[in-house]
Design a protein with these regions (language model features):
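Intrinsically disordered, charged low-complexity linkers and terminal tails
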Residues: 1-170
Length: 170
């Protein structure tokens, strides 16, 4: 483990581990957009995915154009800071998985050996994340959309108080 490692992904099944890598990236880069995600993990990492893109907006999943090739459950959907809901492609062959694991290291994301998911109908794998070296996800400060209005009201209140005390405070 390197000192620059931020997150370790433990996964059950190869594709769930890849999903965990993407979720870890989103934690590390909370202001990231879909375009940033596509730049960080380009389509060239996963050429055999059977879809056009590694990541799509979740409302696009399940269309004839992309079949059922994306994670679609609510807990699998990636929610970006800009409000975008992103679905991640499901198919990750061994070579593609090895490429995304190598790429993830550039962002301080390491993968523990994944374990096989339980076999059988309705069984699916999962992932969990462990923060390393004292790292915690950055807290995104919410932008105050009406800050100027609050500032204006405060200035008006101060002006009214000064006026009141100057003319009626005697």
């Amino acid at each position: 483990m390197a000192q620059t490692d931020k997150v370790r992904v433990y996964g059950k099944a190869q594709n769930r581990t890849a999903l965990g890598i993407i979720h870890a990236w989103a934690l590390a880069y909370p202001n990231g957009t879909l375009e940033d995600l596509r730049a960080a993990f380009p389509n060239s990492l996963n050429p055999d995915k059977g879809t056009k893109e590694n990541f799509i907006l979740s409302h696009e999943k399940g269309t004839e154009a992309n079949w059922d090739g994306y994670f679609k459950e609510p807990e699998e959907i990636l929610l970006l800071q800009d409000g975008s809901q992103v679905s991640v492609v499901k198919m990750w062959t061994k070579p593609s998985f090895e490429r995304i694991v190598a790429k993830a290291k550039e962002y301080g994301i390491v993968v523990a050996e994944f374990t096989e998911a339980e076999k059988g109908f309705g069984k699916k794998g999962g992932f969990r994340l462990e923060y390393l070296n004292g790292w915690t996800p950055p807290v995104v400060k919410k932008k105050c959309k009406l800050c100027w209005l609050w500032l204006l009201l405060a200035l008006l209140a101060i002006a009214a108080a000064v006026y009141f005390f100057c003319f009626y405070g005697k």
